[in-house]
Regions:
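Amphipathic, non-transmembrane alpha-helical segments in extracytoplasmic/periplasmic proteins
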Residues: 40-42, 94, 107-132, 144-167, ...
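An acidic/polar, Gly/Ser/Thr-rich interaction patch typically located in mid-to-C-terminal regions
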Residues: 22, 26-54, 197-354
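Acidic/histidine-rich, surface-exposed loop or edge segments in extracytoplasmic proteins
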Residues: 100-105
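Assembly/oligomerization scaffold segments
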Residues: 1-99
Length: 354
């Protein structure tokens, strides 16, 4: 099939015809979170005829195949232009257009005795976005101290092993490796990737990143004392215990942070990367089910990042995955017979030094 592209200068100018013989490459990076996505367009400016874009110009990029049609990848606001030579060329760099405006303005705000869902609703409302929060978490107190909504929500999401992003007019806070959404905000099902779909792949494990559990401290409002909270990993009892060096305001908050740190450690114990012919349906945070590579590698993998590369030589999609539940079970080794820890973790007394 023949790869094709479309670049539109919003609101309604199609630049594709004038760029057909000048396009050197399109590179689009898609990562989990609010600040990682990026567009790079390299153009042949051999005669100096390519005009510099206006400040704040927005481009809509679509990729696809002549035989099956185009797929919209996203809208980007150009915030960097680079010219070089010889040979003379121009590179345009941009970020998702949804990230512009008030969401980058610094603010001061505080929340008490609420939920993460309510915080997301407040932030979405003042940025004229629709809130979607799939993380259930109680909030004792949160302080936004001269931070942008973008930075603040990214920080809070990480504490709950979640990601925050804006797509299709929606402010999304979703569990890591959980429910991916398309550019229009629709939930995406697990995508099956067979060995014959893949051009090349690489799998690696790292037991040094395994954790036997995570401990932290919390304040007990009833006793006024500090307690040490441990969230163990029954599948890795011999691995070292990690520590979150911040005293939480409650056992629930401490348990949530410890669980988030434990899940992050689990994802880093195995990685899978692969490249395949260009596909627009592969996006960060989507879960792929890989089949036909080999036992121990096959299974469900949450996508950490995707790079779409389009040039005169073709269109290629590069994918990086972190360990999902399937890989954690396979790499954990022999079980110890311990039951899964429920609730917010074990309270250890007296609190030790962290």
């Amino acid at each position: 099939m023949k790869p094709v592209f479309s670049i539109r200068l919003l609101p309604d100018t199609d630049l594709t015809p004038v760029l057909q013989d000048r396009l050197m490459s399109i590179r689009i990076t898609d990562k989990a979170g609010l600040e990682s996505d990026e567009l790079d367009i390299s153009l042949d400016d051999r005669d100096g005829a390519v005009a510099l874009p206006k400040k704040g110009a927005e481009l809509e990029v679509s990729l696809g195949y002549e035989e099956t049609g185009l797929n919209r990848i996203g809208r980007y606001r150009i915030d960097e232009v680079e010219c070089s030579g010889p040979p003379q060329q121009m590179t345009l760099r941009g970020r998702p257009a949804d990230m512009a405006g008030s969401i980058k303005s610094t603010r001061r705000h505080a929340w008490e005795n609420t939920t993460l869902e309510a915080v997301v609703r407040d932030i979405a409302a003042r940025n004229k976005l629709k809130p979607v929060c799939k993380v259930k978490a109680g909030i004792d107190r949160l302080d936004q101290m001269n931070e942008s909504d973008l930075h603040f929500l990214s920080r809070i999401a990480r504490q709950h092993d979640a990601t925050a992003t804006v797509k299709g007019g929606q402010l999304l806070v979703l569990p890591r490796g959980g429910q991916s959404r398309s550019a229009s905000g629709k939930t995406l099902p697990t995508l099956v990737i067979a060995r014959e779909d893949i051009k090349s792949w690489r799998y690696s494990t790292n037991s040094r990143n395994a954790s036997g559990g995570v401990r932290t401290k919390s304040h007990n409002p009833k006793t006024g004392k500090t307690e040490e909270i441990l969230v163990p990993d029954p599948d890795n009892p011999l691995a070292p215990i990690r520590t979150v060096r911040h005293t939480a305001s409650s056992k629930g908050a401490a348990g949530s942070k410890a669980k988030a740190a434990l899940d992050a450690a689990r994802r880093s114990t195995a990685t899978l990367s692969f490249t395949l012919p260009g596909r627009a349906d592969i996006v960060a945070e989507r879960v792929v089910s890989v089949t036909g590579i080999k036992p121990g590698v096959d299974g469900q993998w949450p996508i950490e990042s995707v790079v779409q590369t389009f040039s005169q030589s073709g269109w290629e999609t590069s994918v990086e995955c972190g360990a999902g539940k399937d890989q954690h079970k396979k790499s954990a080794g022999k079980k110890t017979g311990k039951k899964k820890v429920k609730g917010d973790g074990e309270v250890l007394k007296p609190a030790g030094k962290l």
